[in-house]
């Protein structure tokens, strides 16, 4: 199993290196960081523009710039922004913000999706299954930013109905919050509910559909009937044998689900005013900053890499054939 995971990790690292190479080269070709400087009125002298281009390394070939960038990136130095600020410093501050959303959203969304999907398969075509299926399809067909705004409107109505600020929907914390550690922690959790719920709903809707189909494929298999014939109750046969087998394809899907959440986090952070990686990505593209976009690509790729590695571990734990081979 260790050799299997080592091979998978090596494959992921190669893909991460390829993603960083393509992102850096393509953004370097598409971006023009000096455009805002050249469009100033009055236009700066050409010597000033050339000096700025030299500072940003724009007077060197793209491959040479990438080689220099990646040689520093492996040591944690992702260069500077076009304004001269260290990318690594801002990256370290924003990673925690985005991971908070991604971890909470993916964990709750995955667990809820698996439970709902398995429950729907066991109670196929009953009222609860039809309701869950309809709701899942409705969430899947609704863009993330629409779901986020609907949750904000719902929070406004709840706050107005109860007469207190039960849900906060702007920023990561309330400015000037007083009190001890528990008060500040409670404030952060209060701000975390709506954005993480937005991501969790999208994840739960997708996972529930796949889990339901996987569970339905298992329910009619011979080993379930054999387990029942040996005296196991239906509940125990489904939980011990059916659900375990149905979770195997879900382990592979987990990495792709996390990749979708990383994309959805861009909209969620902008809508809820969270200063994370998604919001920074939008700013980096608008300012045509290659170093910012490349650094965020490495972060996003690393998150998907870890999710893929975790899915491989879960897959190996669920499927004995992987451990034996």
Curated annotation (Swiss-Prot):
Annotated compartments: Cell inner membrane
Gene Ontology process terms (BP): peptide transport; protein transport
Chief localisation class: membrane
Molecular functions (GO terms): transmembrane transporter activity
The entry's keywords: Cell inner membrane, Cell membrane, Membrane, Peptide transport, Protein transport, Transmembrane, Transmembrane helix, Transport
UniProt domain ABC transmembrane type-1: residue ranges: 102-310
PROSITE patterns to which the protein is assigned, alphabetical: ABC_TM1
InterPro entries named among the record's database cross-references: BPD_transp_1_N (IPR045621), MetI-like (IPR000515), MetI-like_sf (IPR035906)
Topology of the protein relative to the lipid bilayer: Multi-pass membrane protein
Entry's Gene Ontology cellular component terms: plasma membrane
Transmembrane segments: 12-32, 102-122, 135-155, 189-208, 248-268, 290-310
Family the entry assigns: Belongs to the binding-protein-dependent transport system permease family. OppBC subfamily.
Known role: Part of the ABC transporter complex OppABCD involved in the uptake of oligopeptides. Responsible for the translocation of the substrate across the membrane. Glutathione (GSH) uptake by mycobacteria through the OppABCD system contributes to the depletion of the GSH pool in infected macrophages, which impairs the ability of the macrophage to detoxify methylglyoxal (MG) and contributes to enhanced production of inflammatory cytokines.
Protein name per Swiss-Prot or TrEMBL: Oligopeptide transport system permease protein OppB
Species of provenance: Mycobacterium tuberculosis (strain ATCC 25618 / H37Rv)
Gene designation: oppB
């Amino acid at each position: 199993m260790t050799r299997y995971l080592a091979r998978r990790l090596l494959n992921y690292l190669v893909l991460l290196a390829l993603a960083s190479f393509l992102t850096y080269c393509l953004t370097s070709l598409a971006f023009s960081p000096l455009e805002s400087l050249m469009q100033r009125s009055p236009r700066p002298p050409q010597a000033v523009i050339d000096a700025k281009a030299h500072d940003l390394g724009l007077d060197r070939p793209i491959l040479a710039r990438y080689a220099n960038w990646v040689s520093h990136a492996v040591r944690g130095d992702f260069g500077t922004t076009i304004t001269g600020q260290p990318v690594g410093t801002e990256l370290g501050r924003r990673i925690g913000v985005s991971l908070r959303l991604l971890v909470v959203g993916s964990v709750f969304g995955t667990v809820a999706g698996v439970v709902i999907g398995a429950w729907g398969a066991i109670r196929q075509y009953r009222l609860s299954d039809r309701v869950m299926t309809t709701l899942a399809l409705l969430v899947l067909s609704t863009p993330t930013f629409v779901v986020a705004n609907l949750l904000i409107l719902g929070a406004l109505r709840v706050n107005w109905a109860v007469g207190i600020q039960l849900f906060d929907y702007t920023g990561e914390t309330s400015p000037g919050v007083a009190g001890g550690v528990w008060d500040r922690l409670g404030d952060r959790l209060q701000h975390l509910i709506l954005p993480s719920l937005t991501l969790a709903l999208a994840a739960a809707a997708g996972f529930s559909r796949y889990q339901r189909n996987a569970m339905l494929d298992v329910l009619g298999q011979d080993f379930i009937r054999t387990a029942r014939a040996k005296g196991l109750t239906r509940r125990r046969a489904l939980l011990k044998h059916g659900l375990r087998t149905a979770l195997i394809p879900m382990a592979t899907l987990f990495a792709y689900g996390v990749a979708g959440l990383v994309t959805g986090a861009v909209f969620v952070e902008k809508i809820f005013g969270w200063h994370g990686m998604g919001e920074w990505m939008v700013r980096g593209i608008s300012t045509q900053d290659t170093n910012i976009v490349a650094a965020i690509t490495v972060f996003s790729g690393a998150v998907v890499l870890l999710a893929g590695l975790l899915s491989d571990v879960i897959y190996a734990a669920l499927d004995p054939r992987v451990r034996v081979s």
